[in-house]
């Protein structure tokens, strides 16, 4: 049975998969994002940035599997992602400080931005790569305008420092999101529609992933 390996330490991505009936093997990737972004050059468009980062993360995890977890690498699909928010001509990752998160929120309030999530997928069989692909999903996010006191309370929670763009849809930040256009799970960090398409192209079905990663319909009925 095919294992799904999530190459990310993101609690949001893990929850998306668990809620969708997948209990993945989690192996966090360790990629120097600044080096990858610098290599792309200043003219790289947002979709390329997140796509290349996701592909690099998936490749790093796949290399780890074929070197140290060959039983898993005998039949698995590696999924790694990278998310960034594009708004007002800027591409934003995780804020480095509370002050940076505050500045981001002041620029986002009452506006719309695009949440880009790159998805890197690698299929391993018999410890060899038989398929690899990387694509980007885009969701438009409409931000509300939190009051000064609400914004400070949100910043004090620390949540904004853990996520791209300094906000969440499924956490405390959801209070300040007026709506989304596109797939909501993409905003959390992993687009289920895009992932379904990518795994189908490498010869897998959702049912096969349920069967190989305890948590699907049959498991939940027990």
Swiss-Prot record:
<dbReference type="InterPro" id="IPR003697">
    <property type="entry name" value="Maf-like"/>
</dbReference>
<dbReference type="InterPro" id="IPR029001">
    <property type="entry name" value="ITPase-like_fam"/>
</dbReference>
<dbReference type="Pfam" id="PF02545">
    <property type="entry name" value="Maf"/>
</dbReference>
<keyword id="KW-0963">Cytoplasm</keyword>
<protein>
    <recommendedName>
        <fullName>Nucleoside triphosphate pyrophosphatase</fullName>
        <ecNumber>3.6.1.9</ecNumber>
    </recommendedName>
</protein>
<keyword id="KW-0378">Hydrolase</keyword>
<feature type="active site" description="Proton acceptor">
    <location>
        <position position="82"/>
    </location>
</feature>
<dbReference type="GO" id="GO:0005737">
    <property type="term" value="C:cytoplasm"/>
</dbReference>
<comment type="function">
    <text>Nucleoside triphosphate pyrophosphatase. May have a dual role in cell division arrest and in preventing the incorporation of modified nucleotides into cellular nucleic acids.</text>
</comment>
<comment type="similarity">
    <text>Belongs to the Maf family.</text>
</comment>
<dbReference type="GO" id="GO:0009117">
    <property type="term" value="P:nucleotide metabolic process"/>
</dbReference>
<dbReference type="GO" id="GO:0047429">
    <property type="term" value="F:nucleoside triphosphate diphosphatase activity"/>
</dbReference>
<keyword id="KW-0546">Nucleotide metabolism</keyword>
């Amino acid at each position: 049975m095919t294992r799904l390996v999530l190459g990310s330490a993101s609690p949001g991505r893990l929850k998306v998969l668990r809620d969708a009936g997948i209990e993945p093997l989690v192996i966090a990737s360790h990629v120097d994002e600044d080096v990858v972004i610098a290599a792309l050059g200043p003219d790289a468009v947002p979709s390329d940035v997140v796509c290349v980062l996701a592909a690099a993360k998936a490749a790093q995890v796949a290399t780890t599997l074929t070197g140290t977890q060959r039983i898993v690498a005998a039949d698995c699909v590696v999924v790694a992602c990278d998310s960034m928010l594009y708004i007002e001509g800027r591409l934003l990752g995780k804020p480095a400080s509370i002050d940076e998160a505050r500045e981001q929120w002041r620029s986002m309030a009452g506006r719309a931005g695009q949440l880009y999530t790159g998805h890197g997928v690698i299929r391993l069989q018999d410890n060899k790569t038989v398929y690899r692909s990387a694509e980007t999903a885009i969701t438009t996010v409409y931000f509300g305008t939190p009051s000064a006191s609400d914004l400070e309370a949100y910043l004090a929670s620390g949540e904004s420092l853990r996520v791209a763009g300094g906000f969440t849809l499924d956490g405390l930040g959801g209070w300040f999101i007026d709506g989304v256009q596109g797939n909501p799970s993409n905003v959390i960090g992993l687009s289920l529609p895009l992932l379904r398409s990518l795994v189908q192209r490498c010869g897998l079905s959702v049912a096969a992933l349920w069967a190989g990663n305890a948590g699907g319909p049959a498991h939940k009925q027990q």
